[in-house]
Regions:
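Active-site-proximal gating segment of KS-fold condensing enzymes and close homologs
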Residues: 1-44, 90-93, 197-211
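Glycine/charged-rich beta-loop-alpha catalytic/anionic-binding loops adjacent to active sites
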Residues: 8-19, 36-46, 103-111, 150-151, ...
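Active-site-proximal alpha-helical scaffold in enzymes
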Residues: 29-30, 34-78, 116-138, 227-249
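Condensing-enzyme catalytic core mediating Claisen C-C bond formation in acyl metabolism
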Residues: 100-177, 186
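Short glycine/threonine-rich loop-to-helix capping motif typified by GTGT followed
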Residues: 154-163, 192-209, 214, 228-235
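Conserved small/polar residues in nucleotide/adenosyl-binding loops
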Residues: 252-253
Length: 253
């Protein structure tokens, strides 16, 4: 989009690419996967900012639970590091200004955090009905047993005070999974390294887990990767699966 806006300004509307619209609409990410592989089942792309990839995985799991599909491809990708993308987040004062020490700029939950570092990337997981996976001898890396989502209904960028929305989502996930808060031992936090966001998330964790919150291991992968915006949930889901596979937690936060 940014490239074509520049082209139109410099050379006129006749030079805008005919592929601009197909390239920028979000549903084409899933559309390309279906066309390349001949997948004809449910196909759509959630658009929910930093929760997009997590919603993609969660909604794909719900499709399987409802019997709509037995196998789903889900994930997210992001390519937001453009002049206009950087300028937009900078205008919101969401980015770290620790330019003199970029390697320490992304510091979730640190008292001196001052914003996030933008990143790009993507990840995809294959979700499958358990019985189908077993019947075909598939390697099962992890089981998704609970999913929850909610809305703050508060502000366009700031989380609700006290982390009410995030807490509600975690409670719903625990309820669906049939788990007590005390049965959880690790949380891969959203942890963007923003002042308001990290406070709200910390309060949400404490509200859901109570005293057990102080026994939990909590870390944010963004301390190492930066913030992958729409792809964050998929990347971090893969990190959690690998952590279980190798019995190594991401200790950075």
């Amino acid at each position: 989009l940014a490239e074509n806006i520049h082209t139109m300004a410099e050379k006129g509307p006749g030079r805008v690419s005919p592929f601009m619209v197909p390239a920028m609409i979000t549903n084409m990410a899933a559309g390309q996967v279906s066309m390349l592989n001949g997948f004809k089942g449910p196909n759509y792309c959630p658009t929910s900012a930093c929760a997009t990839a997590a919603h993609s995985i969660g909604e794909a799991a719900e499709m399987i639970r409802r019997g709509v599909a037995s196998i789903m491809v889900a994930g997210g990708s992001e390519a937001v590091i453009t002049p206009i993308g950087i300028a937009g987040f900078n205008a919101n004062k969401a980015l770290s200004t620790r330019n003199e020490s970029p390697e320490t700029a992304s510091r979730p939950f640190d008292v001196s955090r001052d914003g996030f570092v933008m990143a790009e990337g993507g990840a995809v997981v294959i979700l499958e009905d358990y019985e189908v996976a077993v019947s075909r001898g598939a390697t099962i890396y992890a089981e998704l047993i609970g999913y929850g989502l909610s809305a703050d209904a508060h502000h366009i960028t700031s989380p609700a005070p006290g982390g009410e929305g995030a807490g509600r989502a975690m409670k719903l996930a625990l309820k669906q999974a049939g788990l007590a808060p005390s049965e959880v031992n690790y949380i891969n936090a959203h942890g963007t390294s923003t002042h308001a966001g990290d406070i709200a998330e910390t309060m949400a964790i404490k509200s859901v887990f109570g005293e057990h919150a102080f026994k939990l291991a909590v870390s944010s992968s963004k301390s190492q990767l930066g913030h992958l915006i729409g792809a964050a949930g998929a990347i971090e889901a893969v990190i959690c699966v690998l952590a279980m596979q190798h019995a190594i937690l991401d200790r950075k936060s």
